[in-house]
Amino acid sequence: MTCYLRKAKMDDCDLLFEWANYPMVRLNSFSTKPITYDEHVNWFRNIMERKDCVQYIYMEGDKPIGQARIQICDDMAEISYSIIPEKQSLGHGHEILSDICDEVWREFPNVTKVVGKVKPDNIASQKAFERAGYEEVCRVYEIKKNDINNPN
């Protein structure tokens, strides 16, 4: 069945809220705490009004199976994406990452690169990015103020 991206509508708010709180989505997110409904609604309204962000729903026929969001900053687009659990490990990750590039190049001609950030233990997403033609260009290291191993 053919898969494609469509722009999100306000009606997608509850669906995206459900997906955002899937345990694996929270685990692979850079912000792992659960999201409250009020937080999500406020965030979603903001995203839908912004000119530098576009939220997409990834469709398989008439069934939503994932989401992708881009945020534009000058000549760069940063992507965030997820696929519903029952459709993971079927190749949809690299497909959505390829499709989002096509959307970015068409909608934002000034953008020259698309960037995705992946946690070190999210091997499936790393492989999806690589299979879609992205290449790893750096690693980011951080230390938090109250980390036990912080020597300061």
Map each language-model feature to its residues:
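Charged, low-complexity, helix/coiled-coil-prone segments
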Residues: 2-4, 36-47, 69-72
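Acyl-donor (CoA/ACP) binding surface of acyl/acetyltransferases
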Residues: 1-15, 19-20, 55, 59-152
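Conserved GNAT-fold acetyl-CoA-binding loop/helix
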Residues: 24-42
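Residue-level marker of structural boundaries
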Residues: 22-25, 34, 49, 88
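A short helix-loop-beta-strand connector motif used in the catalytic cores of GNAT acetyltransferases and
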Residues: 45-57
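A short hydrophobic/aromatic micro-motif that marks alpha-helical segments and, especially, helix-coil
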Residues: 27, 36, 51, 146-148
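Hydrophobic alpha-helical core bundles mediating ligand binding, dimerization, or RNAP-core interactions
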Residues: 16-21, 40, 44
